[in-house]
Regions:
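Local beta-strand N-terminus motif with an aromatic residue
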Residues: 26, 181-182
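N-terminal Rossmann-like dinucleotide/flavin-binding domain of flavoprotein oxidoreductases
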Residues: 133-179, 273-282
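Short, contiguous acidic/charged loop-to-helix segments that flank catalytic cores in large enzymes
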Residues: 89-91, 96, 137-149, 209-216, ...
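Rossmann-like dinucleotide/flavin-binding elements
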Residues: 21, 96-127, 166-180, 188-197, ...
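Glycine- and other small-residue-rich loops at beta-strand/loop junctions that grip anionic moieties
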Residues: 6-10, 31-34, 165-168, 229, ...
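Flavin-dependent oxidoreductase catalytic cores
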Residues: 1-102, 106, 110-117, 121-122, ...
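Residues within well-ordered alpha-helices
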Residues: 16, 41, 111, 154, ...
């Protein structure tokens, strides 16, 4: 039967896709999400500019399930221009400015790359010792390792565009004034909240999801109550259970000497998370 066969589903690497066709395993490969992350993927592939392709992180953040069902516009965590291509055209500057970006997380890195590629003189200050910010914690969670590719790609683009980095550099009013930039972008991220407003919370040892994901704290035994039932909370619960029994499939509940309970105000866990990610996590 002479029926063309196409394959689809999480094939993010164009070289792998080409290999499937060249070996005669399929007649073609359909790529959806990778073209949201980088609409110029086919053009870059034809020009052998594989390092310039922005990789899809397979996060399923807003490309599968729209955030607002009343305005079902597809979005992309990696490419914020999706749906706004004509709102923010790429225009190289004819008046380069000295730009200081405080913070080397995903937001700071993307801003740095965008400004530098437009021709500005960009410097990034990061109080830590590496780029990535909270993305370094996100990729620790099971199934999120592909997000590392985006961070590696941002670093590649930043270096190619001439972005300068200073690590272990904390911004103050004084040293920012001394640096004398034309523009300052604050991209310092967020800090986890300790709910001191909850009566009696001070009677128990309280940690944050960051403490668990960063391995700053491990919980080999005991009873754990996680306040919140969003994606990060569920991933944290899974990691605690996985640590309790490393060689087993971890689910929330009780394993050995560890018992985890999630407390959520919404009627269900992981409200607003795309259905495939939610089903896998739960």
């Amino acid at each position: 039967m002479n029926i063309p066969v196409f394959v689809v589903g999480k094939i993010n690497d164009v070289r792998y896709a080409a290999d499937l066709v060249e070996r005669g395993l399929v007649d073609g490969v359909s790529m959806g999400r990778p073209l949201l992350a980088d609409p110029d993927l086919p053009k870059k592939a034809l020009e052998n500019r594989f390092d310039d392709i922005t990789p899809c992180g397979s996060c399923g953040g807003r490309c599968i399930t729209p955030e607002d069902p009343h305005h079902p516009v597809c979005k992309c965590h990696i490419n914020p221009l999706v749906g706004h291509e004509y709102d923010f055209p790429f225009n190289p500057t004819d008046k380069p400015r000295k730009v200081l970006i405080i913070g080397a997380g995903p937001g700071g890195m993307y801003t740095a790359v965008t400004a530098a590629e437009r021709g500005h003189d960009v410097t990034v200050w990061e109080k830590g010792k590496q780029i990535g910010g909270q993305l370094n914690l996100a990729v620790v969670s099971p199934g999120k390792q592909e997000m590392c590719k985006w961070l590696t790609h941002l670093n590649y683009r930043a270096k190619k565009a001439g972005v300068k980095f200073e690590f272990k550099k904390e911004a103050t009013v004084e040293n920012v004034k001394e640096f004398a930039p034309d523009a300052v972008v604050v991209a310092t991220g967020a800090t986890p909240l300790i709910p001191t407003f909850i009566k009696g919370v001070g009677d128990y040892p309280v940690i944050t999801t960051h403490d668990v994901l960063s391995r700053k704290v491990t919980i080999p035994k005991g009873t754990v109550c996680i306040l919140g039932g969003g994606e990060v909370a569920c991933e944290t619960a899974e990691m605690i259970m996985a640590d309790a029994r490393p060689n087993s499939f971890a689910t929330t509940g009780s394993i050995g000497d560890v018992e985890v309970t999630l407390v959520e105000m919404q009627p269900q866990l992981m409200t607003g998370v795309c259905l495939p990610n939610r089903n896998i996590a739960l």
